[in-house]
Amino acid sequence: MSSESHDKVVAKAIRLPTENYSVEKEIGKGSFAVVYKGLSLRDGRNIAIKAVSRSKLKNKKLLENLEVEIAILKKIKHPHIVGLIDCERTSSDFYLIMEYCALGDLTFFIKKRKNLVLKHPLIKTVFEHYPPPSTEHNGLNRVLVVNYLQQLSSALKFLRSKNLVHRDIKPQNLLLCTPLLDYNDPKTFHELGFVGIYNLPILKIADFGFARFLPNTSLAETLCGSPLYMAPEILNYQKYNAKADLWSVGTVLYEMCCGRPPFKASNHLELFQKIKKANDEITVPSNCYIEPKLFNLIRGLLTFDPDSRMGFTDFFNNEVVTEDLTRYEQSYEPDLESKSKDVAESNMFVSEYLVKPLKQQESAHIPPTQTDENTSVQTGVRRTSGKERLATNHPPHQQIHPEDNSQNPEQSYQSASQKRLKSSYNDLILEKEYVVVEKKTVEVNSLADDFANNGPITNNQGAQVIKPLRYRTSSSSDASGGRRASLVERRLSISSLSPSNALSKALGLASVRLFGYQHNTKATSSPPQQTLLNPQIFQELTENAVLRADHKLNPFSEQMLDSNITPAVESLAAKAFVMYSFAEMKFSQILPTPPSSTDYDPLSDKRLSNGSCAIEDEEDLDQGRPPSNQTLTSATTKISSATNVDTQIPAPELKKLCTESLLLYLKALTILAASMKLTSKWWYENESKNCTLKLNILVQWIRDRFNECLDKAEFLRLKLHAINTSPNSQWSDDDPVIFVEKLIYDRALDISRNAARMEMESGNYNTCELAYATSLWMLEILLDENFQFNEVYDDEYASNITSLDESDKEMIKKYISSIANRLKALKSKMV
């Protein structure tokens, strides 16, 4: 579909309650809102329309944030704050009619400048007049830095007078408008209340979704905002006041000077530790110079202790903030006003001036050495044919050459180094991952808390509600037998086992963990453990999988009645557990292990690298206890250990394992997020707010797995970063591209083939049944569009991640049908 056709579709799809505004095209998208460019039919001015769907605001806190934003914007009017023109509501959506800022946000000037100056006439003129200080970083000219600092200061001073704290100051929330529209000289510019230089793009603060009224004596405890720009007291979950905004101003000021944030990390805990360890010493890249008085201002704002941090009075009176810029207004660009008006009147948003990605037919002629393979590794998906993606013997060899607008600000856009291209994209992905914590973790935990705090619940038999099920790391037997070895420390060499027996043990363990199955185990006096699901549920799930394969059962409908929400969540929990277990198997190979370990992957009939822990020892399986869960102390409280690359595994193999594990955990996160999204919809449409014991336990389990998967994904990013930045790191254009779909596809077929062999050789029907079901669930995961990565990552990068093409889907459907027939035949033998 062409861009023009798409715009027409959008215009038809979005209908505002009144006829005062028309919608033209989408220009931005966030977690909860889509922003469109529109037109005011009353005066012909361009506007921005922020559309927020009520269905996305299931969490009460999210709805409150929107109401706060509307209330604040209605009360405040300031030339350096994006104004709210109107607000309209329908039964399904909120529409905020706002000022239109045609130049996007400050990140376009910092990260996309080198691309925009080639195409955008106004931006080209600005940077010709105020060139950047260096080609080695993305910092801005000092005049631009001070100009935008003063405009930001003006807006904050106004907010301060209203006892408002923004709480989410960052470059993405600092929008830029075209100058010289309502004025054409410095005098009128300043009479209208603007500060700074009259013929430069104008900065305005936007997005008050996290803002709140906070008097001088008040403290808040809410975790909000974007971690890269968060004050350390917020990162550490401490009470904070309006000074938190000053820290954020310091990070923005530093980024305007150096082209990157002052501190970077892959989770908020590590970020806090880095800030604390710096001990108020702010370092500047060797290729960047900041004048002393500007640097002293940055240091004053980026002071760890909020009590010692520069206050608002000192900030507003700082010599840089109050510097006279009128000498820069003497110069006059004769065509600047016409260029500015042309941009404002055009139908193009700033992002449309960026170089577009090459078409697929063009990319087919690009040699592999010119493509950024790490893009595919990070997302796990690439636009390839079905044969390329799923063929077991022929790796993919063509890919689209993506637009590289997302490089790390420290690096040159014109670098020819493949290593730096890959590293830069990876850095940006790590930065974007912060949004996951903000967007999904808060929602998942909030919903689980709502369930847990719903009061005593009884099941159908009247049993009192128990605590949410969690796997334990120790048991009562530990006291008598000494400390029980952790999963990392215990290893079992099963090379002597046949594939069938090994598969039986591994799948038997999985069945104990999830369904409560326990075959051929020793008698034990240990009390039975409550399992997440039970054998009867397993039978229902497998029967439903067969019926779906035979097209006799439709997927769960959207009618969220109490009678069918639990089965739907059970089905998703089973699929999430399958993906989580696959990721765990890969993850266990990455952690340091005894050199003598020789392990074996029973589900694929292949020997694994040292460090494998494909199955647990027989003690867990025989006693029927949930196995000890792997601890992530080194990943959460000792982050530094994650940067030590395991020397037992060669770097290329370790990198491959880390990438595979990361992709599998991300896929597990998408399934867990989808299950919570389904549950959230039912919960907030359920007026009684009552749930069964079973559903409550499911929700708590999903919450635990979500948090665990997120922690391990962050650990793996640190590991990959350590590998990529190691002095011995070697990049090769021949490095294989890893697709999460192919990992799942190959694994599903391996399990199915081994199960078929076991069925013929050993007759262990129960284990075979579980194996076939596991294979079916894995293949179903590939076909379910709700499990795509953008379920977790609601940002511009999700658009690069595509679903399988039709040939892929047809191939998978054939295997599903075949495996379902085997499972059906097996069940007839078991009757």
From Swiss-Prot:
Coiled coil: none annotated. ATP binds at I27, G28, K29, G30, S31, F32, A33, V34, V35, K50. Residues 21-321 form the Protein kinase domain. It comes from the Eukaryota. The active site is at D168 (proton acceptor). Belongs to the protein kinase superfamily. Ser/Thr protein kinase family. APG1/unc-51/ULK1 subfamily. Signal peptide: none annotated. Residues 360-382, 405-419 have a biased composition (Polar residues). The keyword ATP-binding applies. Its main location: cytoplasm. It is found in: Cytoplasm; Preautophagosomal structure membrane. This is Serine/threonine-protein kinase ATG1. GO terms for biological process: autophagosome assembly; autophagy of mitochondrion; piecemeal microautophagy of the nucleus; protein transport; regulation of autophagy; response to starvation; reticulophagy. Serine/threonine protein kinase involved in the cytoplasm to vacuole transport (Cvt) and found to be essential in autophagy, where it is required for the formation of autophagosomes. Involved in the clearance of protein aggregates which cannot be efficiently cleared by the proteasome. Required for selective autophagic degradation of the nucleus (nucleophagy) as well as for mitophagy which contributes to regulate mitochondrial quantity and quality by eliminating the mitochondria to a basal level to fulfill cellular energy requirements and preventing excess ROS production. Keywords: ATP-binding, Autophagy, Cytoplasm, Kinase, Membrane, Nucleotide-binding, Protein transport, Serine/threonine-protein kinase, Transferase, Transport. PROSITE patterns: PROTEIN_KINASE_ATP, PROTEIN_KINASE_DOM, PROTEIN_KINASE_ST. Residues 360-419 are annotated as: Disordered. It is a peripheral membrane protein. GO terms for cellular component: Atg1/ULK1 kinase complex; autophagosome; cytosol; phagophore assembly site membrane. SMART domains: S_TKc. It catalyses: L-seryl-[protein] + ATP = O-phospho-L-seryl-[protein] + ADP + H(+); L-threonyl-[protein] + ATP = O-phospho-L-threonyl-[protein] + ADP + H(+).
